[in-house]
Amino acid sequence: MTFSPPSKQRIAFLDQAAATYHKQLDGSPAAEYLRKRGLSQDSAQSFRLGYVASPLSGHERYAGLLAIPYINRQGTVAIRYRCISDHDCKEIDKHSKYAREPGDDAKIYNILTLTLPVPRIAICEGEIDTITAWQSGIPAIGVAGAQNWKPMFNRLIRGYTEVITLADGDTAGLKLADAIAEKNEHATTCQMPHDLDVNQYYREHGQAALLEKAGF
Ligand SMILES: [Zn+2]
C-alpha cells in the first residue's frame, strides 16, 4: 500500500466543517450534554467541539450529533460524531453511539499532546475521557476503543519516562491498558473504580482526586 497524505482539500473541508459545527454549539443540546459531563467551555473551545445543527452537504447523516474534530498540525484530519441522546444506544436497532466518515481509520485523539515537553503522558479510551483528563491538568492522548490502538502507535510513546493508561473500571477497560502494557515496559495502568470511567470518576470525586489517582 502506498502512502498518500490527506489532501489539502480534504483538510480544508474538515476545518470548515469543524468551524461550522463549533459555531452551532452555543445553546445546543450538545452544549448541554458537555455541561452535564462536566466539560468546560474552555475545553469545548480548545477541542473545537461542535453540534451538527445544519449539516454541510454530505454530512446530513450526522445531524443532531456532537462533532469531535481530530486535529493535528496540518489541521482537522477527521471528525467523529457522538450520539448525545439519553437512550442506551445499544438498545436501538441499526444505531451506534459513534459515527465516523467512510475511510476514516484509527487515529490518536489530541495528538498535539505529543508535541509538549512533558516526561509523562496518559492514554485514555475515548475522546470524552481524554478531554476530561486534559482539563484536569493531565497531558493525555486517546483512542476510540482498544481495537484502535495500532502497533505503530507504540513508537509514538517511546521516549517518555512513563505512560499511564487510565482504564475504565470494567473488564473491557483493561483491554486497551493491557494492549499497551504488553508492548511498552514503561507503561503502567491506573484503573478507575468499579463501573466508572475517567469522566464519571471526575464528576463523582473531582479534579484533585483524579490527579492524585492518576499520579499527576
Ligand atoms: Zn444513541
List each model region and its residues:
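A residue-level signal for conserved active-site and pocket-lining positions in enzyme catalytic cores
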Residues: 34, 74, 165, 198
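Short, aromatic/basic amphipathic alpha-helical patches
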Residues: 175-184
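Short, acidic/turn-prone active-site loops that include or flank metal/cofactor-
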Residues: 144-149, 168-171, 192-195
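Hydrophobic anchor at the start of a short beta-strand
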Residues: 140-141, 163, 186-189
